[in-house]
Amino acid sequence: MRHSKINSASKISVIIFLIAGIAGASLTERLEGRFLKSRIKLRIDEGWKVQSGNIPGAQATGFNDSSWTTTNVPHDMSITLYSATNLDPGAIGWYRRHFTLPAGFAGKKVIVQFDGVYHDSKIYLNGTQVGNQQYGYVSFYCDLTPYLNATGDNVLAVFVDNETVRNSRWYSGTGIFRHVWLIATDFVYVRNWGTAVTTPAVAAAQSQIRVQTDIVNDLTTAQTRTVQTTIYDSIGNALQTVDTTITVKPKTIDTVMSIDTCVQTLVLSSCNLWSPSTPYLYYAYTRIINNATPADDYVTQFGIRQLQYVANQGLLINGVATKMKGICMHHMAVPTGAAVPERMSERTIKELLASGCTSIRTSHNPVSPEFYDLCDQLGMLVLDEWCDKWYDTSGGAFYENWAQTWPKDLASFIERDRNHPSIVMWSVGNEVASGATVPPYLTTNLQILVPYVKNIDKTRAVTNACVAGSSDPAGLGALANIEDIVGLNYKEAQYGAIHSSNPNALILGTEQAPYLNGAVPTWFAVRNTPYVIGHHIWVGVDFLAEGISSGGPPSGYLDYCIFRKAWFYYQQSQWSDSPVVHIGIGNAVDPAPSTWATPFLSESWNQSGSVNVVTYTNCDSVILYVNATKIGTEYLNNFSNMIMQWPNVQYQSGVIKAIGMKSGIQAAVDSIMTVGKPAKVFLKPDRTTLYADGEDICCLEVDIDDANDNLVFNDSTDTVQFTLSGQGRSLGIGSADYTNFEPFKAMSRKAYNGRVFIPIQSDTVPGTITVGVSSPGLTSGSLILTTVPQVITTAIRSAPLRNTQGSRADLFTCVCNPDSKNIQVRYRVDVPSAISLSVIAPSGRMVNCLANNKYQAAGAYSTEWNAMNRIGVYLFVLKINNTKMVRKICIVR
């Protein structure tokens, strides 16, 4: 069996200074930690109490919650209920969190922001309901200001109901399954999700940046403010600043608050354009200034890129025709359920990129904000989908009260995510209509929804994932007169007829079957058809619930644990530009148990008799060997479906090997070897050093190996047990076996195809985590993970230093290396100057002098300071020609 560690293909995102220290934090959180000085934004994920059940009076301040379970959020209360007879478990329950008002919050406007609460939540502060949100996938916020206790205890209570009404066709999870934030602002402030950064003119030489900012006045008199926006590049250089004076109308009894919009335009030269291959990010830092005093601030990441949707050319990104090689994906993960840590999402996206995938459809709902951050950084395109079914109640009320709540929910969806360059298209619904023809209510609703979206964001195309119209190509083609792209589920056979009915229509495969039982791949209807801009197969990653009850296996090419299945390489052979060859053992065209399933192909060369062999490849030809015997040569041109079959290959113990040839030269090789009996457990962590931030994750793969360290693929269903101690916790244990309903939140599980998966999360205390793994009759294994202090850098002075002689310097970043415990300090000198750089301890004593009046030429410099055994607030002080200084805080935890 293959045993080399999988190396995921990934791009290097150019976000140098953002590497600093908060491994568990998203890009947005790192930006806010770096820049926000007036606004205070705190993540309040720790210290929640949770209890299932509809408990009367649980919102009351004095309610006794001492017997409730203490947990951190994100949290999914349904994952412990998942079973063979309860594939989509709903739940009802309460969350409560006690807090005192943090320092700096007094006299401010205070809101709580929930990135996601599933489902039908009601929010209470100190016994008073302050908000509610029925559709559980959109983010929302509530004003706490009138109900806060300035001193003493405050109680935030959240009620969730995901049981009363069926609202999902797949596993949704239940509870506060995304982050929660406490935010303090001035009473004249930037509205939450109130910035829209667009790029009306794009070129590498020069680009135009348009920044639209909504300013809220929560006071009863008109307020005049200066809106100052500065554009920074990814290493922290300030590029352009613009100031605009605006007078915001007073709030009234009728309006509650008043909102005015400030539009600013800046021009940047020598631009780095965002694209899938060069995911370069800029950010806009906006300050609200009152009589020369900064009162509020906001930071927005964005990319400079141009999207065009051109008839008979397709999707153009910065003028380059781009096909969406896509997958559909639900929001859950094993074994965490709907509460997915960022590290696990990162691992998934990187594996999808390695398959040649370039696009993710967020079927069928918005996902977490940090997921889009990762796509921005890694260059993954996103088809962002709002909802499933609208008000279709067949099989359940999938979107309760859609007609009443859609304007608020759709606006929240678009406004929150509109600045992500990875998002190239909005979908306003999935399979919202059915039938052989396009029904009138579909076109009527699209005529309302599409302009509504365009009023918020004019820069992206709008589509819907349409399954109706199987005998109505003209009706489908006419949708292009309403929406920008005709999105189609399982309609690739009609693309030509639709195009004939409307030659200006652009088509996107929003959902396609993955394998079609050996028929010509759906990708073939896309790759050479300019009016079809891409497709999205169902699905990229296995998911819980839907489909399993009908007896079919999940259809992802990555399994529950993000391990690759054989047909991962089938997709890779279609999508990737790199040479691919991969061996599978079995019949590639066996009747699949459902439309969406794929035949199981073994990756074991422990067989008997004669076997069918499959090779997936994009090479010209493949030469197959069993040991030293050449079985033969096959040519890809002879297989219209790209499934190269080798029937009746005689099994011999040893090695089966496939060599992919291009232009007569060996381009790729794959082999599988005969393995022995299970002998040991082998631990394969993706990292051994974690940040002690309560968020960082080690993704631990545990293999069942033979005595020679080879994975035993077929015959290893041994029960794997583990222990964990130290400064961390397990988030559960999973395998890829969809028929195994052992609890995910457990300390043991049967292996499947020789593997289990254990995500391990750090806590907030530096130290070590010891993991022991065993299986009856096998040699045990162990692992020690190290958790190190997290480092957060915050600028006290935002402007670079310039002294009277014109010398200029800037201390703009500190980056922690968790392996060496060194903090790399970077600074820049614009003209030759004498530089001093020192580190001041919390006591006020200088503990290190990194540069002492050192004369340095113009340029960028870096040095390192070892933070071993350091905890507290340290100050980096940069002096220029012994006069002025720039200071930066470094918090070591």
Label every PLM stretch briefly.
Residues T794-V831, V839-V847, N852, R870-I871, ...:
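Surface-exposed, proline-anchored Ser/Thr-rich loop/turn motifs
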Residues I40-A58, S78, T164-R166, L182, ...:
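Substrate-binding clefts and catalytic carboxylate motifs of secreted carbohydrate-active enzymes
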Residues S26-D115, S168-I176, G584-A588, S604-S610, ...:
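Extended carbohydrate-recognition surfaces in non-catalytic/accessory domains of CAZymes
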Residues L125, Q206-K249, A284, V611-K630, ...:
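Beta-strand-rich binding/interaction modules
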Residues N126, D297-Q301, L316, N848, ...:
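C-terminal tail/sorting-segment detector
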Residues L42, N54, T85, G90-W193, ...:
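Accessory beta-strand-rich segments of carbohydrate-active enzymes
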Residues P276-P279, S820-Y827, P832, A851-N881:
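Short, surface-exposed loop/turn motifs with a glycine/proline- and acidic-biased composition
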